[in-house]
Regions:
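Thiamine diphosphate
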Residues: 1-25, 107, 114-212, 230-233, 240-394
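Short coil/turn connectors at secondary-structure junctions
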Residues: 102-106, 131-135, 156-160, 183-188, ...
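Short alpha-helical segments and helix-capping/turn motifs at coil-helix boundaries
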Residues: 89-98, 148, 172-176, 232-236, ...
C-alpha cells in the first residue's frame, strides 16, 4: 500500500511492476550516450598518444593491466654476511627503491613514520597539489585513511600502492586491510618494529598479538623475513602477487645476514618455509622452526644442540600462508610426520603454532604484553636466548 501511495503521489501507474518512469529512462539513456561518446573520444586521443609516444603508452598499458616489464627485478640487491647486522626495515627500503626504478606506477608512503619505516622513494618527490608526479605520499597520522586510499588506488588500476607504519598500528588500519583482502586487491603493507625488539617505547608500541590476529584474516599474506636477503625476496613475492594484499613484517633492530648454500632464498621464500640448515649426515631428532629475527637465534641454538649430540634441523618459516599452498609432499619434506619433536620460536603470542609443531611440540612465545627496556635485555628476559632454547628443546 505504501508503494502504491508513493506512485499515486508522483502520478505513476499504481499497479505497474518494476516501474521505470519515462523521464528516468530518458535521463539514463542520455547518460549512456554521453558515456559512449566520452569513451570514444578518449580512445581516439589515446591512439594518437600511442602513435606519438609508443614507449610511454606501453608503460601505461602495463600499469593498467598489472604486467611487469622485463628485467623489473634486475637491480634488486643481495647481501653477504659481512653486511650484517642489518635491520630488515633497512633492507626493505633498498629493495623498494630498486624496484621503483623499473615500475614508475609504484607509489606509497607512511603514516608519519617515514624515517623509521624506510618507504621513501629517493628523488621521486612528494605527491600533492604542487606535484602530481610525486610518488611519496605523506599520509600523516591517519593509518585507516592510508590503508583505505591504498585499496582505492588498487581498485582503480594503473597504480601499485604500498602503505607503511609500525606493526602495532595495524590496529588502526585493520578494517581497510580487511576490505583489501576481501576484494583481493594487491596492496603492499610495510609494517616495521615488529616485536619487543622495538625496545624502550614499551608495551604500547610492542606488537604481541598482531601476527596471530592478522594471520587469521583470509586472503592476507604475511611475510616475516629472517634477514636482508629474505626481505629482498619478500618484496619480489609481494610485487608478483596480484590476487590479494601482502604484508611485510620487519624488524627495527639489526639482525645477522645469514649465509645460505644451495638453491638460495628465492626458492625457499617462494615456498613459505624451507630447510635452512639440516642435521649433519643424519635424520633430524629435532626441528627448530622460526620466523623473522628469531631465525638467527634458532641457528645459534642448533649449533649448541649439535655439539651435545642432538641432530637438529632449522626451518625458516617467513609465511604460513604461502606454505599452506604447497603440496603435502613438500610440507612433509620440511616437517616429516615421523619427527614429532619440534620447537617454534617467535617473538609474539604462541597462538597458532600448534598447526606446525603438533601436540608433541613446544613454542617459545610471548603470551603477555611487553615492557620498556633495551631490546637485548627484553629478549633475554622473555626467554629468547640460546640457553633457554636448548633447555626447551630437551
Amino acid at each position: 500500500e505504501e508503494v502504491k501511495l508513493t506512485k499515486r503521489a508522483y502520478g505513476w501507474p499504481e499497479d505497474a511492476h518494476f516501474l521505470v518512469p519515462p523521464r528516468a529512462l530518458e535521463h539514463m539513456r542520455e547518460a549512456v550516450d554521453r558515456g559512449a561518446d566520452a569513451e570514444s573520444e578518449w580512445h581516439a586521443r589515446f591512439d594518437a598518444y600511442r602513435a606519438a609516444h609508443p614507449e610511454l603508452a606501453e608503460q601505461f598499458d602495463n600499469a593498467l593491466d598489472g604486467r611487469l616489464p622485463s628485467g623489473w627485478d634486475a637491480g634488486l640487491p643481495s647481501y653477504d654476511e659481512a653486511d650484517g647486522p642489518m635491520a630488515t626495515r633497512k633492507a626493505s627500503g633498498a629493495a623498494l627503491n630498486a624496484i621503483a626504478d623499473h615500475l614508475p606506477w609504484l607509489l606509497g608512503g607512511s603514516a608519519d613514520l617515514a624515517p623509521s619505516n624506510n618507504p621513501l622513494l629517493e628523488g621521486s618527490g612528494d605527491f600533492g597539489p604542487e606535484d602530481y608526479a610525486g610518488r611519496n605520499v605523506r599520509w600523516g597520522i591517519r593509518e585507516h585513511v592510508m590503508a583505505a586510499a591504498s585499496t582505492g588506488m588498487a581498485l582503480h588500476g594503473g597504480l601499485r600502492p604500498y602503505a607503511a607504519t609500525f606493526f602495532v598500528f595495524t590496529d588502526y588500519a585493520r578494517p581497510a586491510i580487511r576490505l583489501a583482502a576481501l576484494m583481493r586487491q594487491p596492496v603492499i603493507y610495510v609494517m616495521t618494529h615488529d616485536s619487543i625488539g622495538l625496545g624502550e617505547d614499551g608495551p604500547t608500541h610492542q606488537p604481541i598479538e598482531h601476527l596471530a590476529a592478522l594471520r587469521a584474516m583470509p586472503g592476507l599474506r604475511i611475510i616475516r623475513p629472517a634477514d636482508a636477503n629474505e626481505t629482498v625476496e619478500a618484496w619480489r613475492e609481494a610485487i608478483v602477487r596480484r590476487d590479494g594484499p601482502t604484508m611485510l613484517v620487519l624488524t627495527r633492530q639489526g639482525v645477522p645476514v645469514i649465509r645460505v648454500d644451495g638453491p638460495g632464498r628465492a626458492i625457499g621464500l617462494q615456498l613459505g618455509a624451507y630447510i635452512l640448515e639440516d642435521a649433519d649426515d643424519a635424520d633430524p631428532d629435532l626441528i627448530l622452526v622460526a620466523s623473522g629475527s628469531e631465525v638467527a637465534l634458532a641457528l645459534e641454538a642448533r649449533r649448541a644442540l649439535i655439539d651435545s649430540g642432538v641432530a637438529t634441523r632449522v626451518v625458516s618459516m617467513p609465511s604460513w600462508e604461502i606454505f599452506r599452498e604447497q603440496e603435502a609432499a613438500y610440507q612433509h619434506e620440511v616437517f616429516p610426520p615421523d619427527v614429532p619433536n619440534r620447537l617454534a620460536i617467535e617473538a609474539g603470542v604462541s597462538f597458532g603454532w600448534r598447526e606446525w609443531v603438533g601436540d608433541a611440540g613446544a613454542v617459545i612465545g610471548i603470551d603477555t604484553f611487553g615492557a620498556s627496556a633495551p631490546a637485548g635485555e627484553l629478549f633475554q628476559q622473555y626467554g629468547y636466548s640460546v640457553d633457554n632454547v636448548v633447555a626447551a628443546a630437551r
